[in-house]
Amino acid sequence: AREQREGVGRAAGAGAGGDTPTRGGDVLERAEGDDEGGAEGHAPSDITLAVIIPAHNEEQVIAGAISSSLSLFNHWDIYVVSDSSADSTAEIAAKTGINVLELLTNRGKAGAIEAVIEEFSLTENYDGVLILDADTELHPGYVEGARRQLADPDVAAVSGFVVSEWKPDERSFVGRMISAYRDRLYFMLQYLLRFGQTWRRTNVSFIVPGFASVYRSSALREMDINPGGLVIEDFNMTFEVHHKRLGRVSMNADTKAYSQDPFTLKDYYKQVSRWTLGFWQTIRRHRVWPSSFWAALSLYILEVVVVSLVLLLMALLGLFVALGTYGGDTVMALPFYEEGFTAVTAFLPLSVIAIGLFVPDYILTCLMAMIRGRPSYLLYGLFFLPIRLLDAFLALRMIPRAWTTTSDGRWSSPVRARS
């Protein structure tokens, strides 16, 4: 059976055996399941969750995310929204019998999330909504952990605990290096920073990562998910929770999910650029308001700016001294070079700069190799410093761009490995 209404082509009936979809405007819906959802319960087992998987040209990985979700949820509780995909993303999803909504114009991730929530009235039919990236797979204990945290009525959002997917056989040397670097970064950030930020007496976490996190429906109804002008959605959604005092952000290691990191330096550059630009754009949008959240955020911003400046300055000084040391008379003959070289090396010889930049960072890598039981990190860690410098450069470069550029949130998919 088919039903037409303005802007929507609807194929009723769950599963791959539904009618062929029709195009009636901006939205194409392929399969629709039951819209049943219980009221908010006190026991974790009573809490109903919907799963949203926004996707744009994700045919390489969408099957893995759906399979992971189907192992933990009924098929009628899973909703894929294909945001103007030019590949077979929507067809692959529809064959699994889950709900699929296909957007005919690229709205971006935030717009896709907003569209599927509205189309299926998810915040009216479920107690919470899990937003899952198409390249992410859930740990078997994820749902139980999320429900346990949502059982606390003060919790507005449950932050996923990110673990870098480690499949070295599918990656080049550069891809393995990026994955190892990200694994170290996520481990340190979550255990040394974010657990403290999400403690119930602090509640100052500035990011609920959009790769695999749950929002309470009552909080989602109050949020402006897609305000426009932002390149990504997850910083804004987290700021909305704090700015509108919708509740606290919770995080625990029992909500693990495995995320696929970029395979190339080009995709890494694009991803970090988007994340960093999105962070500064969100600060521009929400501005400052009196709160412990902003007090903690101010300290974090100060740390990011100062550390990035120091890292880049030390790297430039190291390059300057190295050229003077090994470049010979040709370099020293340049105007003012010898005077500058003498002044810098009087306080910072090349050995001190090299040790300061490399040794502390590599010690962290050695510890991570022991914790993870992955000796290969000792090799990849030799090349982490250039990635750290790239992160520092992008953190500073995106500050002025956040105030001078406007983004529409549209996305393009990076290189993926088939799930």
Language model: regions and residue ranges:
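Short, acidic, metal-binding catalytic loop of nucleotide-sugar glycosyltransferases
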Residues: S67-W76
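Short beta-strand-to-loop acidic/aromatic patch adjacent to the donor-nucleotide binding site
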Residues: E124-E137
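Catalytic donor-sugar/metal-binding loop of nucleotide-sugar-dependent glycosyltransferases
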Residues: G229, F239-A257
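Long helical/loop segments within the catalytic core of UDP-sugar-dependent glycosyltransferases
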Residues: A110-A112, E124, P140-G228, S273, ...
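Acidic helix N-cap motif at the loop->helix transition within catalytic regions
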Residues: Q60-G64, D87-K95, G141
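Juxtamembrane C-terminal module of membrane proteins
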Residues: R2-S45, V288-S298, G324-S419
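A conserved acidic beta->alpha catalytic loop
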Residues: S68, S82-A90, T105, T136-E137
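Conserved donor nucleotide-binding strand/loop of the catalytic core
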Residues: A90-E119, F161
